[in-house]
Structure formats: structure tokens, C-alpha cells
Amino acid sequence: MSGKSKKVKGTKQTLEYVEQPEKLHVKAIKCKNAKQKEFLKTLDEKIITVCTGSPGSGKTLLALYSALKALEKGQIECIYLVKPVVQIPGEEVGFLRGSLEEKLDPVNWSFYGNLDKLIGESWRKKLMAEKKIISVPIAFLRGVNLDHARVIVDEA
């Protein structure tokens, strides 16, 4: 990260800060094939879209891109990120301390990596702090009003 330094008057302290654009800007992506184009079009046109594909085919990246573009345009107010939190036998991690967000962090690393590609780490953290991007276990969505939101259920 490149930042600027600013000397604080009356002290020997120098603060580092990173300039961040005021408005969300989602990096443009280019679909690699016709199926990706069709998936992206379906995400923008349909209320519910179900997609299957091999690992690395762009399902998560395209779903996040579509949701971020809708957020950028003001078409939605927030994005819910949902992944199963069920442990796979033989891959148990045991009890995790901390808040719900801290417990879900390891599960959401693939979301975070893709979000960082599209908007950068600082914007991801900003939108998460503002509850514009919300990570939640699916069980916690019961009774939640999803008007003006995009829900991405990954690896279900």
C-alpha cells in the first residue's frame, strides 16, 4: 500500500494514511466465454439464479461483481455473503474464539480474495464495517428482510 506521510504539529510523530476514493468503484472484468456472459446476464435479470460449474470457473467472482455493481449503482443496499459452516470430517478446526465475524473469517477467505480483486482490501473492510457487505451463516437469515439486498450463497 502506498500512502502519504503527514507530520503532526507539536509532536515527533508521523502518521501514515492511504487515500481512498470517496465513491465505490468496481474494477471492470471481462467474461472469458459465452457461459460466463450468460451467467452475468442472468444475475442482473433474474431474482434467483443457481449456478454450477467446476472450481475456478468464475462463479463466485462473477456473482460478487454483479452484486458490487448493483451496490455501486444504488440498486441494492447491502450484500449478504453465505457459506456453509459445516466442518468436513477430518478437517475439524475445533472451537474458535471471538465474535461471529472472527469465527466466519476463515470460511470467507475466498470471498475476501475476490472482493479485494474487484474493489481493493480497504474498500472491502469499509463496506463490511458499514454493514454494506455482511457475512452470515444461513441459519441466521431466518426472518431477515432481504428487500434491497443481494444474497450470494456459495459452495452450498
Protein language model regions, located:
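Conserved RecA-like ASCE ATPase "motif II neighborhood" in helicase/translocase motors
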Residues: 129-156
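A generic local structural motif
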Residues: 36-38, 120-122, 135-140
